Amino acid sequence: MAKIVVTGGAALHGEVSISGAKNAVLPILCATLLADEPVEITNVPHLHDVVTTVKLLGELGAKVTIDQGTLSRGSAIVVDPRPVNQHVAPYELVKTMRASILVLGPLLARFGAAEVSLPGGCAIGSRPVDQHIKGLQALGAEIVVENGFIKASAKRLKGGHFTFDMVSVTGTENVLMGAVLAEGTTVLDNCAMEPEVTDLAHCLIALGAKIEGLGTARLVIEGVERLSGGRHEVLPDRIETGTFLVAAAMTGGKVTVNRARPNTMDAVLSKLVEAGAKIETTDDSITLDMQGRRPKAVNLTTAPYPAFPTDMQAQFMALNCVADGVGVINETIFENRFMHVNELLRLGADIQVEGHTAIVRGSEHLSGAPVMATDLRASASLILAGLMASGDTTIDRIYHLDRGYENIEEKLSSLGATIRRVP
């Protein structure tokens, strides 16, 4: 099983380009099932979860064409949903990736039936699917959960009013996709406002959907008879953007991230400024300059967008490990999302966990050690800590990393990091 070895000590300098957003491309690929003509998706990152989604679309009968036949950086994927002849998403694929549940709404809306295995994929909490089920039931779907499958049917979904009990990104996306082909008008309240949800809505609109309220907690969808083909470019990944900016801040370097979307980064950028970074932005780039200084510890609480993202919590914990002062991190989104703490402790970090709160006392010195990635963002935090540790840090189970970061070792190497992948 492959590992990544990081040798610490180098400040990062240079420029790096950001890939398409993992959390946008997965629902957008699933949304192609709603169309009755081919759909082209561009700026697709080469990630394991994208490969899994492409396999799932193929299992359902869709014809998927990837430029040059393989997924390379910034690929284009054309999905032709016309040959779809299955409505069952099998356990073998769904168990490896929770986002597989995002075919539920499209299959139900387009073909009147869907069977999706209950999801697996992440070890960071229960992430209940009840909001998906309740939302689609509010649109007239008949749904039962049996034998490990969500089984849904409806002749045609009908517009309705549904308020999410809790903010759910994938729940919002699934019900939104179901509503675009429903008969009549649907009003969804307490929707997730994440940029990736808005990007999905922009894609649906490009295919002919009628959606109002983008970027707000209320979405109003006027159902249409059909969605046509079209083209959509996936927005840049704000979590990858934040990860590289934190790496620059931790190492006292200066890095410019290009092909970024600064207007989706307010919460993260404000915390980096609080940590002592000098930041300049353009419409599509962010430059962070630490001017050789050690970062200051920051306090943060994760919450739904536009507040601080849970997907950046582990990276900022790594920053606090080497910062000047004490930082308090409150995790309010997922339980069990401090699994990286024990691995950071192996590098010499000083962290105390009390329930959903971690108290991090900054240290001027970390030392390299073998560590194990436990989930996607935890694996990134271990790489960041490794950049600051003396000697080598060897990170095992990096298949987590490949689910959400495209060529991270190449990109970090281009900025001056000593990092390599080994068998």
UniProtKB/Swiss-Prot annotation:
Q: Which UniProt keywords apply?
A: Cell cycle, Cell division, Cell shape, Cell wall biogenesis/degradation, Cytoplasm, Peptidoglycan synthesis, Pyruvate, Transferase
Q: What does this protein do?
A: Cell wall formation. Adds enolpyruvyl to UDP-N-acetylglucosamine.
Pfam families reported in the protein's UniProt record = EPSP_synthase (PF00275)
Signal peptide range equals none
Originating organism: Stenotrophomonas maltophilia (strain K279a)
Q: Where does UDP-N-acetyl-alpha-D-glucosamine bind?
A: 98, 127-131, 311, 333
Q: Which domain of life is it from?
A: Bacteria
Q: Which GO terms describe its molecular function?
A: UDP-N-acetylglucosamine 1-carboxyvinyltransferase activity
Q: Which protein is depicted?
A: UDP-N-acetylglucosamine 1-carboxyvinyltransferase
